[in-house]
């Protein structure tokens, strides 16, 4: 579980816009001279605000002059995220999508194949949202396998949590939340009240994650 001290670093996403992104990217200035590609994992429940965060985070990285790739996953759903991210597409940002696959294992193989091809594109950073086909630990294990371990290293692991998260979650949802929070370097709160109760919401989520 994420400790109280770690959770005090929760960031804010206010509403669907006006996101405050303060992710630590101290290594950005050093990445130009490295061979390994940083891979950022963005996790969170369906509807938590992952795509909105990816859009803002990718825009921030582009302003730093980085070349980035975004790998979208449409397993089990019609992919609308790609449409929301299209405006990022350009010389320094490419969007890739994993589509189709009748089962999870087939989709995982396609996911790995796509990561292999992206490793050869000269990106500084690759942003991945693996929900539906991997949990974070499984994804880490996959990156340690040949040939991905030659090209990738873990960058930021960021979990998006809706500030209005229900108190009474199913056992499966509680396990998933705890697992994602435990692996995250940063927890980002989405949909915080702009005018009041921000601190109360933060404390409630911290308490929920740590219980």
Residue spans of the language-model regions?
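A short, aliphatic-rich alpha-helical micro-motif
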Residues: 120, 178-181
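Charged helix-capping and loop-helix junction motifs
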Residues: 172-176
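Position-driven detector of the extreme protein N-terminus
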Residues: 12-14, 32
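Short, positively charged and aromatic/hydrophobic N-terminal segments
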Residues: 19, 23-33
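G-domain G4 guanine-recognition motif of GTPases
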Residues: 130, 160-164, 186-204
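Conserved beta-strand/loop subsegment of P-loop NTPase cores
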Residues: 69, 153-161, 181-192, 211
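Nucleotide-state-sensitive switch-loop elements of NTP-binding domains
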Residues: 37-43, 48, 52-170
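Cationic, low-complexity basic patches in intrinsically disordered or flexible, solvent-exposed regions
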Residues: 5-7, 14
């Amino acid at each position: 579980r994420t400790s109280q001290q770690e959770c005090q670093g929760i960031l804010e996403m206010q509403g669907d816009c006006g996101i405050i992104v303060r992710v630590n990217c101290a290594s950005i200035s050093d990445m130009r001279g490295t061979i390994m590609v940083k891979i950022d994992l963005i996790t969170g429940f369906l509807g938590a605000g992952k795509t909105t965060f990816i859009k803002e985070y990718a825009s921030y990285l582009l302003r730093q002059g980085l070349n980035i790739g975004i790998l979208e996953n449409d397993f089990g759903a019609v992919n609308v995220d790609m449409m929301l991210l299209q405006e990022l597409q350009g010389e320094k940002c490419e969007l890739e999508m994993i589509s189709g696959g009748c089962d999870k294992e087939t989709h995982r193989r396609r996911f790995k194949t796509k990561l292999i091809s992206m490793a050869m594109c000269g990106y500084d950073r690759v942003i991945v949202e693996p929900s539906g086909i991997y949990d974070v630990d499984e994804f880490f294990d996959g990156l340690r396998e040949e040939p991905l371990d030659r090209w990738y290293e873990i960058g930021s692991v960021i979990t998006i949590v809706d500030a209005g998260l229900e108190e009474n979650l199913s056992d499966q949802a509680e396990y998933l939340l705890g697992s994602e929070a435990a692996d995250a370097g940063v927890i980002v709160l989405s949909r915080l009240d702009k005018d009041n109760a921000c601190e109360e919401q933060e404390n409630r989520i911290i308490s929920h994650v740590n219980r």
